[in-house]
Structures are given as C-alpha cells and as structure tokens.
Amino acid sequence: LIVGNKQNIYFEKYAKDFPKNQPQTIMSITKMFINLFVGELLNNKSINLDKKVSYYLPKIGSGYANAKVQDVLNMNVINAYTEDYTKAYSSSFLHEPVGGWRLPKSGDTHLSQESYLNTIKSKKNKNLKNKSNLAFYKSANTDVIGLIVEKISGKSLRHWMLRAVEAAGFEDGLYICLLYTSDAADELRS
C-alpha cells in the first residue's frame, strides 16, 4: 500500500510475504492501466463508449461484436468465453498460449492476441448484454479494450504503458506481459 501526492510518499507498507525488494506481478492491475488509457481517449473525444466493439474492431468475433464498449469495460458481457480455472476446458486455458504463459499444443498455430479474440463467439440464442447485476470477470474483456486503445491511437500498449510508468516516476523495473497485436509486435522489432 502506498499513499502519495505528486512526488511525496506519505505511507508505504508491504505484506509480510511480499517484501519491498521482491519482484511482484501486477496481473489485474493491468486492467486499471487500460481504464486510464480509455479515460485519456475519452477526454480527447477519441472514443465513444456507447459504440459497439465492432465499430472499432470490425473483425472481432460474435462474442464481442455487438457489445457496447462500456459493457466490456464494466465486465458486463455474456459470451462463450469462460474464465473458470476449476474447469479443465475453460476458454482461459486456450487463451494462455497467446501470451506465452503456456506452449501451444503440438501442431497448433500460435495465434496473435487479435486473432484469438476474433474467435470468441456469442452463446447460442443469447444476447451479449448481462442482465444479472453481477459482473462476469473475463481477462479477454480487458484484452479487447486494449486492442481498441491500440486501434484508435495507432500506438501499442507498450507505448501507453511506458508513458504511464514514466509519468508515475517508478524507480525500479516493472515487469508486465502485454499481448500485442501483430502491428504492435512489428513496432518492437524496429
């Protein structure tokens, strides 16, 4: 926990099992960064949260095409993607090779993030809108929003993240896995 204002840190406390000098993953904190980036696009009037995802990502699969961007941000989309780590055939396990968390099955083609997200379908005879008043947590939602940020801005998530980290004044290394579109991956090679 860190409490600060501008360049001043007023309080800093670490859990016993996460000492200050130990690298730690930021996992879902990535979602916070993506929301900050969307906020900047919103402030610049570059994004309309009431538009359907397919407006920004024309090739996106039926699992997101007709969802409003706001609903994806709110984890308020019902589709065939599942993120239940207790289920052996959860979609999330198929998503892991995209980011390099697992090796693809022998003979499988390695998909880009965008290619994988384009395969997510809607549930049969189901509207994408969640009417249950419960959030449906899915990392794929954040990945879809990340692609939208890249498409609108023409800049990779790497670019966005570096800007945010430098503005925050982080002193030490930040290790983060960003799943790039093919265009963004090409940017890294140049």
Question: Language-model features: where?
Answer:
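Second-shell loop/turn segments in exported
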Residues: K20-Q24, P58-I60, L128-A135, G146-E150
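Active-site SXXK
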Residues: Q7, Q24-L49, V72, I145-V149
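Active-site helix/loop module of the DD-peptidase/beta-lactamase fold
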Residues: N43-Y85, K124, A140, I152-S182
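Flexible glycine/proline-enriched surface loops and loop-helix/loop-strand junctions
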Residues: P19-K20, K124-K131, N141-D143, L178-L179
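Aromatic- and histidine-enriched alpha-helix N-cap/loop-to-helix transition segments
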Residues: M27-F33, Y64-A67, F136-D143
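Single conserved hydrophobic/aromatic residue that forms the stacking wall/gate
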Residues: Y180-S190
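Short, charged, amphipathic alpha-helices and their helix-cap/turn boundaries
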Residues: I9-F11, T86-N130, K155-L174
